């Protein structure tokens, strides 16, 4: 029992250390829902260390050293290593549908329904998750060096992690608020004690 608990503790500590090395883009290109689940999968031996294109070769080498594994080339199935890119919205084509807002893991897109949206270049991790939901195909990825005011490198991992946590908390809070509103509506429509 104690040995199992020690192994779980070591695995948890290793996952935290691995997560500390990951770039926190939360891009899901690794095949996991975010950097933390990927770190946990590496720590327990369920995932290889070469599935993170944003981290590239330098990350793979650091993960190999930390996890005691041999370095591997980046798995091309997960993407290719390249310069930092950011999302850019063609504001003339944006219809303000707001479908790009929820998938952005760090809330780097600002706007309101029925109004033009824009990407805050200094916050964009380059995850590309905003592209697919756009019904008018007005979002494209550009090298950060070609966008005025954009840094050449991705935001620091600790800031991405904090913004990702805040994004998740905001979504949970909104879901709870919507559930409470729905309960009040059902109660108002059906009265107390009457099944909906």
Task: Indicate where each model-derived feature is located.
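Long, charged N-terminal interaction/targeting segments
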Residues: 1-77
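Flanking helices and flexible, charged tails adjoining ferredoxin-like Fe-S electron-transfer domains
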Residues: 4-8, 78-82, 121-196
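Ferredoxin-like iron-sulfur electron-transfer modules
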Residues: 14-25, 44-54, 73-96, 101-102, ...
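Surface-exposed charge patches
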Residues: 62, 102, 132
